[in-house]
Amino acid sequence: MFSSITNIIQNLRTNPGGTIVTLLYVAVCILFSLIIHECAHGYVALKCGDPTAKMMGRLTLDPRKHLDPLGTICMIFLRVGWAKPVPINPNNFRNYRRDYILVSLAGIAANLLMCLASLLISAVLSKLIWQTDVINSLAEAGKKTFMLNIYDNSLATSVYAGMFNMFGDYAKTPWLMYVQRLFLMLAQMNLGLAVFNLLPVPPLDGYRFLDQFVFKGRLNMNPQTMWIIQIVFLFVCFSGFLSGLLTTVNSFLMGIFSSFFAMII
């Protein structure tokens, strides 16, 4: 995390305009991704019979209702984070165990859908951005994912990083790269959020799913134990170990998704 802060400070000194624009892109993507995640929990809970989130004003796109300061900071610097959990009352569920599982997975499902939708839009944009010769050359080499997968050190990586001039000569509609950058970031952040929330650590969604689906609600930790686990988990996040592991998983999944959507380019 601290190396990320140092990099941002250095970039502000060497390229202040570009760094500020990047931070604005990141802020928009973080807000949207976290809000969608939490609203999905509340909406599914409402459909399952629990109106708590709606009654407390959490079924809204207002970021002030959702953002957690520490989770947002982690999202900016670590690309993984969290928002304020949507309040639910499982006692209102029509089918306690089934509905608890559905609500737990709702945020993850919403982020995965946003990732896939963003990649679909990015694929359409790639068809509009790059010259036909470039697309044909990549197709012949079996490398069309280079236009979508930010982990490939390729066209998508450059667009994601805002380095438009590097391949500007190969673009027929260069200004669309600014639009595609937003959707590539949305794809990466939503995938990262989905994978991160699958971790079986309280208070993440993966823990709630594990508790209900595997242990049938028997993981009754006391508040002190939960607090200790969360503190240890934060230290693991800040150490960078978890970030490297999640990047490996995200890269693998992004490769699969990119291969699928590259077929329409």
Report each predicted region and the residues it spans:
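Hydrophobic transmembrane alpha-helices and their immediate loop junctions
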Residues: 1-265
